[in-house]
Amino acid sequence: MTISPPEREAKAKVSVDNNPVPTSFEKWGKPGHFDRTLARGPKTTTWIWNLHANAHDFDSQTSDLEDVSRKIFSAHFGHLAVVFVWLSGMYFHGAKFSNYEGWLADPTHIKPSAQVVWPIVGQGILNGDVGGGFHGIQITSGLFYLWRASGFTDSYQLYCTAIGGLVMAALMLFAGWFHYHVKAPKLEWFQNVESMMNHHLAGLLGLGSLGWAGHQIHVSMPINKLLDAGVAPKDIPLPHEFILEPSKMAELYPSFAQGLTPFFTLNWGVYSDFLTFKGGLNPVTGGLWLSDTAHHHLAIAVLFIIAGHMYRTNWGIGHSMKEILEAHKGPFTGEGHKGLYEILTTSWHAQLAINLALLGSLTIIVAQHMYAMPPYPYQAIDYATQLSLFTHHMWIGGFLIVGAGAHGAIFMVRDYDPAKNVNNLLDRMLRHRDAIISHLNWVCIFLGFHSFGLYIHNDTMRALGRPQDMFSDTAIQLQPIFAQWVQHLHTLAPGATAPNALATASYAFGGETIAVAGKVAMMPITLGTADFMVHHIHAFTIHVTALILLKGVLYARSSRLVPDKANLGFRFPCDGPGRGGTCQVSGWDHVFLGLFWMYNSLSIVIFHFSWKMQSDVWGTVSPDGSVTHVTLGNFAQSAITINGWLRDFLWAQAANVINSYGSALSAYGIMFLAGHFVFAFSLMFLFSGRGYWQELIESIVWAHNKLNVAPAIQPRALSIIQGRAVGVAHYLLGGIVTTWAFFLARSLSIG
């Protein structure tokens, strides 16, 4: 950290342009107003595709970085408005159409529902009996559990929150308009990274966490403590009563009687009745202890508020981001991070790529924590919700990581300047990209052949009736010894590395079985040969996804095959006529291929999770403590062959969706069929060339001309890239809908 003389650096200040862009509904009402060519209107059907492709591609509309920055900033507010409207709708459904109050009174016997279908032509069958005399569609978003943890005790509070969401949405829409049309920040404001870091760290993350910790302590915890003790929701004081009448809090948490005295006398241990370090799960609800999560958010708040004072703005003290980056040199890394500051303040694609990679990874980590450490009350015994939350967060994370590859490649094509990056880390990566990609390719081949080979071996041995020669827990063992060691370490943590904790962070590592209402909430997950094998399939598919995305970024500007890629742009079908064998080399095509492998990777991950949990975790607990799992522990012996995966997982568990006709789950049956249809439809776009369709169209146009009904707008076949885009979109949509129907019909049947 350096203390700088005040005259050396420009002062950070808020600088705006007043009324830079007029508000014109007349202009906005004209399709394609953002692009001179598109604004002329359609001559061919390609126009509508280009309209969609370029509407949000601000780089194609202007080369002025300041204007692009303002458009992105304004779009962020628009996005937040959409999020608030969406959230408001969720809360409104909870208030108006749900059985939340009934569920709250009996959460272990009544299932959550927030949608009742109108019986127009017999759809009333979808309204299943969820208990307590309520008929509706069972929901698996986990919102009821979140609401209970937040301290909602009746539908009126949900209504109020829904209205609050709409107010916030209106505010965001206004802000988006205001900061583009009335007071638009100058470029230097967007590039003032130190102020941004301080604001985001201390303000958004620090004070945001502090506010949430405050809500948890003053509202959530007292209400949940009373609910856990069996007090009826209508008899629980309202949230503001706990805040205005400290005596009500002191009855539940005695330290409240002492007020702030222990805080200012540094006698903080007094507060350990509501800021705890227990570990494990609350045995009543199967969720994390709210006093642990409040403590966690308070600690996070302290850390981030401190972190938000690290960067130098107008007071001559603190870090400069540019200095940190330029000082970051290793013995073998040349100029190190020199030049990266300029990249990250002038290329929003580079910035976005890094943020997407980090946020995508974080989202996947969230997926793992949602079941290992279920944060909300009663969430852990709703198996359909647990499966839905895991799948949802895995897929979202996957899309974000592919997005990182996409924007990394766009940065390389549009924003990278080789002359400004000489011998820094980025330049050095690009210069030894062949070594990186060829090694990664070798790793993929090694993992692919070996992991798949283990399955092929097992299928063959089982077919030949030689179980003693198979890789399994009962024959040739391949135990995941490192994973077991990590589990053991975490199980021993209470009393060793975390001496004040009462239980391990997650019972997935080891410890006891937590049962709520006779169902397993969480228990130790034993790992064996079957897990070892499928984990190497995960390693294989993840490395292939990384290979495709990384190759797309590193070869986005040039390759031996197409040296002038940078001139061709981010997306192009082939290197022009007369150069065969140069298709699918653009940055866009790598994203296109990366999406398939991302989907491939995550399908195996969610299948593994679904079967493993049903086999070895989820189930019923009898009074003597013995556990009966949903699929009776068949994972260890069935998941070691390909045939086992096909027969005992896909086929056996598809019974619920295939046989759903005539039941409340029948919507999943039709979605299962529709998903397969959409998937098959995608292959029509992926497996046929543009010429086929152009020929067909010209024949159809000829017929129209014969009948004098020729269209004014000339029909054109989709371009090669457009066809691929439509293909991959339907491939993923069809696959996701099929998996959704398969998982939900299955998990709602066992729930």
UniProtKB/Swiss-Prot annotation:
EC identifiers of the protein: 1.97.1.12
A GO biological-process term: photosynthesis
Keywords assigned: 4Fe-4S, Chlorophyll, Chromophore, Electron transport, Iron, Iron-sulfur, Magnesium, Membrane, Metal-binding, Oxidoreductase, Photosynthesis, Photosystem I, Thylakoid, Transmembrane, Transmembrane helix, Transport
Protein localization: Cellular thylakoid membrane
Entry annotated with the keyword Flavoprotein: no
An annotated GO cellular component: photosystem I
Single GO MF descriptor: oxidoreductase activity
Gene3D superfamilies with a match to the protein in the record: Photosystem I PsaA/PsaB
Catalysed transformations (reactions): reduced [plastocyanin] + hnu + oxidized [2Fe-2S]-[ferredoxin] = oxidized [plastocyanin] + reduced [2Fe-2S]-[ferredoxin]
Membrane-spanning segments: 72-95, 158-181, 197-221, 293-311, 348-371, 387-413, 435-457, 532-550, 590-611, 665-687, 725-745
Cofactor binding note: PSI electron transfer chain: 5 chlorophyll a, 1 chlorophyll a', 2 phylloquinones and 3 4Fe-4S clusters. PSI core antenna: 90 chlorophyll a, 22 carotenoids, 3 phospholipids and 1 galactolipid. P700 is a chlorophyll a/chlorophyll a' dimer, A0 is one or more chlorophyll a, A1 is one or both phylloquinones and FX is a shared 4Fe-4S iron-sulfur center.
Domain of life: Bacteria
List of residues binding phylloquinone: W693
Binding positions for [4Fe-4S] cluster per the UniProt entry: C574, C583
Binding site residues for chlorophyll a: M684, Y692
InterPro entries: PSI_PsaA, PSI_PsaA/B, PSI_PsaA/B_CS, PSI_PsaA/B_sf
Chain positions recorded as chlorophyll a' binding sites: H676
Mode of membrane association: Multi-pass membrane protein
Principal subcellular localization: membrane
Subunit architecture: The PsaA/B heterodimer binds the P700 chlorophyll special pair and subsequent electron acceptors. PSI consists of a core antenna complex that captures photons, and an electron transfer chain that converts photonic excitation into a charge separation. The cyanobacterial PSI reaction center is composed of one copy each of PsaA,B,C,D,E,F,I,J,K,L,M and X, and forms trimeric complexes.
Family: Belongs to the PsaA/PsaB family.
NCBIfam families xrefs: psaA
Function noted in UniProt: PsaA and PsaB bind P700, the primary electron donor of photosystem I (PSI), as well as the electron acceptors A0, A1 and FX. PSI is a plastocyanin/cytochrome c6-ferredoxin oxidoreductase, converting photonic excitation into a charge separation, which transfers an electron from the donor P700 chlorophyll pair to the spectroscopically characterized acceptors A0, A1, FX, FA and FB in turn. Oxidized P700 is reduced on the lumenal side of the thylakoid membrane by plastocyanin or cytochrome c6.
The protein's name: Photosystem I P700 chlorophyll a apoprotein A1
Organism this protein belongs to: Synechocystis sp. (strain ATCC 27184 / PCC 6803 / Kazusa)
Gene transcribed to yield this protein: psaA
